[in-house]
């Protein structure tokens, strides 16, 4: 069932880590909803800053947030003004002390979330879904991917009946757990309704580090 399951969730504990890192007993539901609020708030506030993912860690009454973005300058702002305003807003939203880290994404064309968002924005600007997918696949392969697959679903070209069309290049081994596959979804709001975008990017295998064993008596 490797074709059906989310490739990121399948690899957690193998080559991937959790995006929310905390432990909770009876506060689990409250923390979970707080995480959802934080991610939704950051997504809306930094909608133009190419944010890929938000990692959240908790310790006592403190929340550490790591924002992965392709445009760190836009998130930080002049003299750190934007990130400080964001921190204050999150302080009031959560009622806790918030610390924000910014991590730059060096190659945006190898990040599935940024690629999916880019295709969705092109679809909203009335660019052909075929052209948008093919151009993005070429850019991703040139950036160093070993394989990429994209799929757009919905009323393509304003058709009465919704359908899905996908394009792929290279290999995307979904069953291989050591394969570093990034997966993301996005949505495009068009005049005919919503279009769904899915992206799979295969960035190569992640090999476990070999432990050096000393051989005695030689």
From Swiss-Prot:
It comes from the Bacteria. Pfam families: KH_2, Ribosomal_S3_C. The lineage of its organism: Bacteria, Bacillati, Bacillota, Bacilli, Bacillales. Binds the lower part of the 30S subunit head. Binds mRNA in the 70S ribosome, positioning it for translation. CDD domains: KH-II_30S_S3. Residues 38-106 form the KH type-2 domain. One of its GO terms (cellular component) is cytosolic small ribosomal subunit. Part of the 30S ribosomal subunit. Forms a tight complex with proteins S10 and S14. Coiled coil: none annotated. This is Small ribosomal subunit protein uS3.
